[in-house]
């Protein structure tokens, strides 16, 4: 609860823009510690998604323990803020237009099932257009690989992970 309270204290209108972002993605330029502003996936997107996940987990724990559950309503407020700020309502495009951004929104199941399925199609297309190259860091590795697996796209995972050129 303390970490959630801390994230809540850092949130502005439901958005948390405090954290490390998608570290270690392949990039050109200076060292990662001075290159965070060039991350493709907005730090506020990945941070807010983690904030949302924390609210969902606390909600589940509260219900299991038979306690009052203020977290479910809070999670829906966070979800609404995240979608409003990072997902185009008309096109479904996620801010950052990258593997991590798409994977993040899908991993946290922020969209309706049919919208999530379209997002996963777009993610597979994005990866193919990038020559099957990995284009994510530490957070994206969890999001992208898990969601491709969940959607049965092991063919995409295989092509990504067997690249012999960088980054592969």
Where are these regions (language model features)?
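Active-site core of glycosidic bond-cleaving carbohydrate-active enzymes
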Residues: 1-168
């Amino acid at each position: 609860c303390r970490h959630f309270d801390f994230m809540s204290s850092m949130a502005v209108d439901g958005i948390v823009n405090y954290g490390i972002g998608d570290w270690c993605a392949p990039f050109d330029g200076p060292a990662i510690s001075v290159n965070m502003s060039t991350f493709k996936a907005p730090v506020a997107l990945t941070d807010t998604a983690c904030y949302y996940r924390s609210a969902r987990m606390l909600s589940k724990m509260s219900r299991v323990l038979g306690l009052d559950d203020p977290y479910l309503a809070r999670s829906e407020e966070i979800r609404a803020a995240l979608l409003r700020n990072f997902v185009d309502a008309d096109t479904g495009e996620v801010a950052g237009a990258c593997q991590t951004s798409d994977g993040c929104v899908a991993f946290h199941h922020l969209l309706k099932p049919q919208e999530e399925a379209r997002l996963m199609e777009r993610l597979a297309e994005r990866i193919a257009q990038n020559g099957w190259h990995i284009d994510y860091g530490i957070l994206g590795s969890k999001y992208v690989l898990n969601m491709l697996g969940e959607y049965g796209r092991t063919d995409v995972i295989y092509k990504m992970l067997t690249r012999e050129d960088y980054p592969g």
